[in-house]
């Protein structure tokens, strides 16, 4: 017999689900630029050099628990009581040692699916909504995706082979503020981290 196969995109046109459950949007850790302190305080703009249509700082989870500030001159982690994040400005202020260099590692939501963004830029798509991501390991999203796939299989009994492709958790594709590839890692799982998973 002839096998009929078809691809389906689980996330395609599912922005409504992701918007209702922002805490279950995919995340990755980002690291700020290295900045040298000129005095006893320093402000670092976290999203400098990152594409803000693709990534958004995670302010839902406690920065003091999930972020890390490092004095790159000494290699020491800066205590959490020595820094504060100003959500309105998107800057983190640190009590510093003059002329020491600092970075911030922080969580960010992937608010534009990187594969979709890549195709959007490469193919010069117009009038196409940015596709949001969501993390299928999180409880509500996991159930939603299982239900959606089950219904699709029931609605398509004539299909006997389903091929899954482009599991984004398998690689990382991060763009800079000029829509260029800033960080690409095809064999890692950098974009599959979250407080839920780290717990």
What are these regions (language model features)?
Residues 1-6, 10:
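Single conserved hydrophobic/aromatic residue that forms the stacking wall/gate
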Residues 13-15, 166:
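A cross-domain feature marking catalytic cores of carbohydrate-active enzymes
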Residues 18:
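A short acidic, often aromatic-flanked loop/helix-cap motif at beta-alpha or helix-coil junctions
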Residues 22-199:
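Polysaccharide-binding and catalytic clefts of secreted carbohydrate-active enzymes
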């Amino acid at each position: 017999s002839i096998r009929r196969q078809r691809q389906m995109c689980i996330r395609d046109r599912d922005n409504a689900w992701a918007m209702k459950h922002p805490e279950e949007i995919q995340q990755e850790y980002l690291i700020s630029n290295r900045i040298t302190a000129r005095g006893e305080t320093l402000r670092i703009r976290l999203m400098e050099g990152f594409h803000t249509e693709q990534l958004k700082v995670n302010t839902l989870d406690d920065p003091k628990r999930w972020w890390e500030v490092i004095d790159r001159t000494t290699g020491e982690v800066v205590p959490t009581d020595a820094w504060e994040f100003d959500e309105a400005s998107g800057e983190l202020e640190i009590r510093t040692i003059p002329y020491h260099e600092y970075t911030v590692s922080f969580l960010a939501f992937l608010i534009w699916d990187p594969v979709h963004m890549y195709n959007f830029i490469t193919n010069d798509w117009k009038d196409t909504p940015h596709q949001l991501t969501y993390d299928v390991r999180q409880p509500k999203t996991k159930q939603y995706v299982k239900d959606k796939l089950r219904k699709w299989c029931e609605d398509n009994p004539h299909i006997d082979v389903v091929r899954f492709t482009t599991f984004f958790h398998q690689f990382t594709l991060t763009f800079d503020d000029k829509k260029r590839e800033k960080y690409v890692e095809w064999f890692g799982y950098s974009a599959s981290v979250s407080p839920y998973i780290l717990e």
